[in-house]
């Protein structure tokens, strides 16, 4: 998943090795096309939000280990 988002030029923050999430940083309107494709392609789930990991910037996150 990480490589997919990086390949389309989206900032990725990966905290899964410390029990966190994989964050995709961006406004929902800008990243939803890629998120929807990843959800379908990799059969993952996640949610939109903002958190400490992103410096409280908007994005989408998943706990998937794919």
Language model features: what each stretch is:
Residues 1-66:
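Accessory DNA-engaging acidic/polar modules
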């Amino acid at each position: 998943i990480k490589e997919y988002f990086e390949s389309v030029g989206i900032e990725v923050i990966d905290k899964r090795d410390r029990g966190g999430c994989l964050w995709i940083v961006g406004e929902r309107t800008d990243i939803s096309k890629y998120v929807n494709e990843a959800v379908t392609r990799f059969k993952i789930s996640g949610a939109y939000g903002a958190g400490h990991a992103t410096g409280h910037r908007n994005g989408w996150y998943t706990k998937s280990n794919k």
